């Protein structure tokens, strides 16, 4: 039994422990094995000799007959996956093994992320969220600017993943300055500044988007996620939009990273494709700078391009960075310069960011430091030079495919030709119907058929 050893106390209540009281538990009342554990420790040799005697008998502890016979050999149990047993009315969705759930549900999730979230379709070069934004803006279009918050709310009828993803995608489209005309503070890709809140900025479709992106007669439609609305499967884009804008996305097991290309070069290359000539495309960046495309390899997997900032030497104590590499920002570039200076890799006096309409980062040098050597050090140890690995992955026939940018251009050009042919056929049918109706009216009046009615 458990006993309490407490010193005498003058307090009237003797049932509570006082400071300094000790508690002694008689472990032998519970189990001889527990009592043996409570004894003074013995040597390892004594423990080995006594272990056999302890395991030779069944411990009469609190678990009673639950204690296994030590002498009995336990055969290894072979792990086998049992087939799911179905009760009346149950289906595989009600009863499934863990392995089956992993194989089916994870693959379904991965396929959904690839096809419906991260990777663009080759037909129009758009991700689903971008396509739904443009479709919602087309429905709202009356020639005037709309609040971005209003556009986001309209798009949520088609995109079931929340306002944050829609807002980020719309800002990204607006910063490319191709499909959307913007009004207000939409941020700056050069400095890394974010856009203002959606209730403060406005947007509308550009004239270019209205001309080359939309045509309800040649659009294939599908039901929205809740079945209440119609949305386009793909938009009838008559331009290599994917190569003009570029895109970046991360899915389950793969990613895509397509560089933007020059608008005029894409038009010229499309004409060359129609004439059967060989074409070769290289990226073009709105941030300027220098680009080494020696290992571009049509933007396929394993490709690599090097990007450099443009550095101007003003005098012996001043360098000015005029352009920054694509994907970097002036803030990140300045931080990399400061870190390199703190690590004694470059010697600078001060870094000042005077970026306004154009990028201007002043790098002031101490007296006696070579500006040429400092420029080399800036390229070697800072973000004045970075590398990017393109990876052209697009959705073709509902499957992700890795192709080159020239292949994307050829398929886009062929799709544009088919769309134009289809539009001409529709226009021809409309004109024939109009001519036919006009001819019937003429016959009706000239022959005075109305008198017979």
Where do the PLM segments sit?
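Hydrophobic side chains in well-ordered alpha-helices
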Residues: 266, 333-336, 374
């Amino acid at each position: 039994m458990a006993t309490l050893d407490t010193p005498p106390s003058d307090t009237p209540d003797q049932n509570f422990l006082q400071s300094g009281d000790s508690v002694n538990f008689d472990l032998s009342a519970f189990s001889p094995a527990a009592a043996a554990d409570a004894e003074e420790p013995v040597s390892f040799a004594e423990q080995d000799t006594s272990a056999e005697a302890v395991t030779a008998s069944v411990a009469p502890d609190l678990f009673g007959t639950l204690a296994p016979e030590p002498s009995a050999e336990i055969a290894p149990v072979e792990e086998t996956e049992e087939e799911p047993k179905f009760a009346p009315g149950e289906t595989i969705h009600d009863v499934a093994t863990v392995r089956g759930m992993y194989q089916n549900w994870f693959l379904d999730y991965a396929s959904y992320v690839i096809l419906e979230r991260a990777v663009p379709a080759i037909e129009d070069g758009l991700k689903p969220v971008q396509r739904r934004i443009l479709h919602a803006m087309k429905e709202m279009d009356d020639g005037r600017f709309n609040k971005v918050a209003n556009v986001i709310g309209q798009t949520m009828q088609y995109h079931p993943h929340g306002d944050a993803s829609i807002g980020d995608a719309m800002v990204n489209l607006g910063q490319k300055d191709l499909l959307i005309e913007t009004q207000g503070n939409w941020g700056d890709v050069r400095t890394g500044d974010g856009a203002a809140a959606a209730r403060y900025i406005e947007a509308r479709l550009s004239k270019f988007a209205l001309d080359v992106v939309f045509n309800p007669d040649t659009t294939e439609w599908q039901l929205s996620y809740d079945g209440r609305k119609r949305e386009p499967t793909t938009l009838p884009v008559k331009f290599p939009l994917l190569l003009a804008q570029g895109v970046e996305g991360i899915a389950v097991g793969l990613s895509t990273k397509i560089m933007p290309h020059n608008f005029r070069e894409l038009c010229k290359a499309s004409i060359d494709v129609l004439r059967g000539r060989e074409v070769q495309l290289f990226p073009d960046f709105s941030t300027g700078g220098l680009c080494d495309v020696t290992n571009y390899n049509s933007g396929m997997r394993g490709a690599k391009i090097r990007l450099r900032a443009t550095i101007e030497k003003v005098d012996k104590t001043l360098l000015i960075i005029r352009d920054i590499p694509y994907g970097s920002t002036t803030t990140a570039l300045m931080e990399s310069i400061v870190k390199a200076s703190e690590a004694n890799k470059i010697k600078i006096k001060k870094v000042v960011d005077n970026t306004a309409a154009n990028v201007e980062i002043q790098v002031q040098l101490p007296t006696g430091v070579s500006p040429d050597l400092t420029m080399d050090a800036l390229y070697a140890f800072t973000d004045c030079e970075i590398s990017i690995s393109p990876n052209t992955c697009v959705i073709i026939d509902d499957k992700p495919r890795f192709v080159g940018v020239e292949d994307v251009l050829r398929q886009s050009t062929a799709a544009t030709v088919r769309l134009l042919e289809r539009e001409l056929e529709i226009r021809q049918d409309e004109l024939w119907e109009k001519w036919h109706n006009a001819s019937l009216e003429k016959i009706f009046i000239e022959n005075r058929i109305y008198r017979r009615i």
